[in-house]
Each structure stands twice: as C-alpha cells, then as structure tokens.
Amino acid sequence: SHVYETRQHDRERLHVAGVFACNFTNLMYTMAADLLKNTHIPFSALLPLIAETAAKIHTLAPRDAQTGPARRNDENVMNHHLSLLTSDQQQLYKLLSEEIRKRNR
C-alpha cells in the first residue's frame, strides 16, 4: 500500500477510477456468473483467466494487456457471442467492444 498526497480533484479522479477498476469489474463477474447459470460450468472455471488478467497489469499497461475478440477484430466470434446474449447484454457487449476497438486502433 502506498500513501499519496493529492489535491481534491486528484482524489475525485482516483475515486471514479476505482469505480471503473473495481465496481464495474465486479459487475462483469456477476454477469459472467449469470451467463454460466443453467450450464454445468461453475464460475470458478473462470478464476485462472481472471487471475492471469489481473497479474498482467502488474507488468503491462492495461491497454497493452487487452486481449479478446474485439481487440483482434474477430467479427465471427463477436457475432456468435451476440447470438447467445439477451438484448440488454448485447447492448453492453457492443458498447464495451467498440470502446476496446477505439482504444486499440
């Protein structure tokens, strides 16, 4: 743990960064668990992938650690994924995928 002396504006930015890094990530875990309901695959099957992803940002910038179909522009995989999702899930998948694409051009 590290102590930083910051201005109010910096603390506010740190807080919202924490929401993106932690709160929204936890929502993604919840959504992943929901997607695995009614399968014979437990959420724990994702834990090695989650741990590997988290470990990468200790040595790489988050942008450089980005992987997946949006990063690769793999339209076939993305379209198949969309076919497995509800309308609300599709909207979020598309929004996040587009953000990944924009940041990795």
Model-derived segments and spans:
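Internal alpha-helical scaffold of NAD(P)-dependent oxidoreductase catalytic cores
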Residues: S1-H58
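NAD(P)-dependent Rossmann-like dehydrogenase/reductase catalytic/cofactor-binding core
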Residues: S44-R105
